[in-house]
Design a protein with these regions (language model features):
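Q-loop/switch helix immediately C-terminal to the Walker
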Residues: 82-103
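Conserved ABC ATPase "signature" region
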Residues: 102-128
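Conserved ABC ATPase signature
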Residues: 132-136, 140
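Hydrophobic anchor residue at the start of the ABC signature
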Residues: 146
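Catalytic Walker B motif of ABC-type/P-loop ATPase nucleotide-binding domains
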Residues: 157-160
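H-loop/switch region of ABC-family ATPase nucleotide-binding domains
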Residues: 189-190
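Conserved beta-strand-loop-alpha-helix hinge in the C-terminal portion
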Residues: 209-231
């Protein structure tokens, strides 16, 4: 359900939103009454305990955004028996013909290889493109998943814990890279310091509700403790 509020002149265009929406899975309602508006140019970090509904909300956003959204799922969504190159290439499968995709599977297209090599280099994956993904470390697999989303070249980056398996310094570098290439991002994270440092707006979820929705510069890590308090 999309909110149809009047947009004030000078207000960034709304990209996606929910107006008293019910979100969940089959018989399991995760958000019984969710109202949220996301505008162009926002960089949003979604925080909250495991199982609180971050992926559920990202899925609903993806459905609204369609081919505007570059999707970076958790690293285990890669195809393990294919090479890093082919997993990244899959980000743009729909852009090429079936015939081109088939040929590329056997013999990588030179232009695609060059573009993906350059992208892989910025992500510290040089030399690993031919390696099967299940022979990469967890952090390397995560960078392949990010590369695949960046290769989609879509306006909005939607990431489900894209830096969960890397150290904080590398996480910061990867988030910078994502921000450089995407004006608008919505990313689920567990690292609150990274959220405060790299995003403009923090949305904190708990118990089927948004309990924090504030500019990052107004919050401290302690303000986010409430999201992780034991039951
Ligand atoms: N396919 C599904 N069918 C039914 N319930 C589901 C399904 N996927 C998730 N859930 C439930 O919905 C709730 C929210 O799950 P979700 O995956 O959105 O949480 P999350 O915050 O992304 O968790 P995590 O940080 O562990 O990835 C959980 O209670 C989960 O068990």
């Amino acid at each position: 359900m999309l909110e149809t509020a009047t947009v004030e002149p000078g207000t960034p265009a709304m990209l996606a939103g929910f107006d008293h929406a019910r979100l969940g899975h089959d018989h399991h309602i995760v958000f019984p009454d969710l109202t949220l508006r996301i505008s162009q140019g926002e960089r949003i970090a979604l925080l909250g305990r495991s199982g609180v509904g971050k992926s559920t909300l990202l899925d609903a956003l993806r459905a609204q955004l369609g081919d505007q959204g570059a999707w970076c799922p958790q690293a285990n969504a890669l195809v393990p028996v294919l090479s890093a190159y082919h997993n990244i290439y899959m980000g743009r499968l729909a852009h090429f013909s079936r015939w081109q995709n088939l040929i590329n599977l056997l013999r990588p297209n030179r232009a695609c290889w060059q573009e993906i090599s350059a992208l892989a280099e910025t992500l510290g994956l040089d030399g690993l493109l031919r390696r099967q993904v299940d022979q990469l470390s967890g952090g390397q697999q995560q960078r392949v998943a990010i590369a695949r989303a960046l290769y989609q070249k879509r306006p909005v980056f939607i990431g489900d814990e894209p830096v969960a398996s890397v150290d904080p310094r590398q996480g910061a570098r990867l988030l910078e890279l994502i921000n450089e290439r995407h004006h608008t991002c919505v990313v689920a994270l567990h690292q609150r310091e990274l959220a405060l440092a790299h995003f403009d707006r923090i949305i904190g979820l708990d118990d089927g509700r948004i309990i924090i929705d504030a500019p990052a510069h107004e919050l401290t890590p302690n303000d986010l403790d409430v999201l992780y308090a034991p039951d």
